[in-house]
A protein has these predicted regions:
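Acidic/histidine-rich alpha-helical segments that form the ligand environment
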Residues: 80-124, 132-153
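Short, contiguous alpha-helical
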Residues: 6-20, 28-82, 126-175
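A generic structural signal for well-ordered alpha-helical segments enriched in polar/charged residues
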Residues: 14, 18-21, 25, 101-108, ...
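Residue-level preference for long, well-ordered alpha-helices that form the structural scaffold
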Residues: 1, 5-8, 91, 95
Length: 175
């Protein structure tokens, strides 16, 4: 199970890196322009993925409190800050830096897990408390689906702008 999740989170990190590279080539105005998506701009979608990854990791952290290596992997997240609204160029650079920190923390966290950790109960605060917890492996699947979904939104917007991309799927580079 660990090998599978490592493949997915490494692919996630690679896709985020490539997307950040594409978005960095846009003007700040183009990156921040309201594109009529739920999170408005390309920057907003990118930051939503980063922020949700940090949020999911906070849930995962609470599920494995006795795994010191997993806890250590998430320590860099303490440096994170939420960047809201339209960003300046300098803030965008910070958002990209945060994305790299979050993606590395996620890979390191998965590397630190043992087989029983994947069954650890993760407390969730949605679905009206039913169920109150789900296994960590399930939440990891939800994370992967979530990030792929939003990368797909970014990809669709980039397509409409005639910017070459294909980063909503899995890369075979990791095989």
């Amino acid at each position: 199970m660990k090998k599978i999740f490592l493949t997915f989170v490494k692919a996630n990190a690679e896709a985020n890196k490539v997307i950040a590279g594409i978005l960095e080539k846009l003007s700040n105005d183009d990156r921040e322009k309201d594109r009529k998506s739920y999170f408005k701009s390309l920057s907003g979608l990118f930051r939503h993925n980063t922020g949700c990854t940090a949020y999911f990791l906070s849930l995962y952290k609470a599920a494995v409190p006795d795994n010191a290596e997993a806890q250590k992997a998430l320590a860099p997240l303490a440096k994170m800050e939420e960047l809201k609204g339209k960003l300046t160029e300098e803030q965008w650079k910070k958002a990209v830096s945060f994305s790299k920190i979050v993606d590395k923390a996620l890979v390191d966290f998965i590397n630190a897990l043992n087989d029983t950790d994947f069954e650890a109960p993760v407390t969730i605060d949605w679905y009206k408390g039913k169920p109150p917890t789900v296994p960590l492996w399930f939440m990891l699947e939800q994370f992967i689906a979530h990030n792929t979904h939003h990368r797909g939104q970014i990809s669709q917007i980039l397509d409409s702008l005639k910017i070459d991309n294909d980063y909503s799927g899995i890369s075979v580079k990791l095989l």
